[in-house]
From Swiss-Prot:
Keyword flag DNA-binding: no
Family named by the database record: Belongs to the bacterial ribosomal protein bL21 family.
Domain of life: Bacteria
One of the GO BP terms on file: translation
Protein name: Large ribosomal subunit protein bL21
Disulfide links within the chain: none
Assembly information from the UniProt record: Part of the 50S ribosomal subunit. Contacts protein L20.
Source species: Chlorobium chlorochromatii (strain CaD3)
Gene Ontology terms: cellular component: cytoplasm; ribonucleoprotein complex; ribosome
PANTHER family (alphabetical): 50S RIBOSOMAL PROTEIN L21 (PTHR21349), LARGE RIBOSOMAL SUBUNIT PROTEIN BL21M (PTHR21349:SF0)
SUPFAM superfamilies, sorted: L21p-like
UniProt cross-references to InterPro entries, sorted A to Z: bL21-like, bL21-like_sf, Ribosomal_bL21, Ribosomal_bL21_CS
Lineage: Bacteria, Pseudomonadati, Chlorobiota, Chlorobiia, Chlorobiales
Length: 96
């Protein structure tokens, strides 16, 4: 069985035991999160009741891969290079 959940305006299709990276959550490592489920999906793509919630545990807080922002104005000797690493939270789905 799978569940469709929303975390920080992003939707994820998860099943029990999945590990995924989501935008930074205000929870300590080892805390359990209760996430409202939008829909429960059976193996035959049948939508079940959406009254359940999903339990997840926070594994760690990490940074995502670096994204380079490069600006340049030709013939003006102007170059600007910045990097950004988004903070993410690694979670594991315990139960649906």
């Amino acid at each position: 069985m799978q569940a469709l959940i929303t975390i920080s305006d992003k939707q994820y299709l998860v099943k029990q035991g999945d590990k995924l990276f989501v935008p930074r959550q205000q929870a300590a490592i080892g805390d359990k999160l209760t996430i409202a489920s939008l829909a429960q999906i059976d193996g035959a793509n049948t939508t079940l009741q959406n009254s359940n919630s999903v339990q997840a545990v926070v594994l760690e807080h990490v940074k995502d891969e670096k994204v380079i922002v490069f600006k340049k104005k030709r013939r003006k000797r102007y170059q600007s290079r910045n990097g950004h690493r988004q903070q993410m939270t690694h979670i594991e789905v315990l139960s649906l």
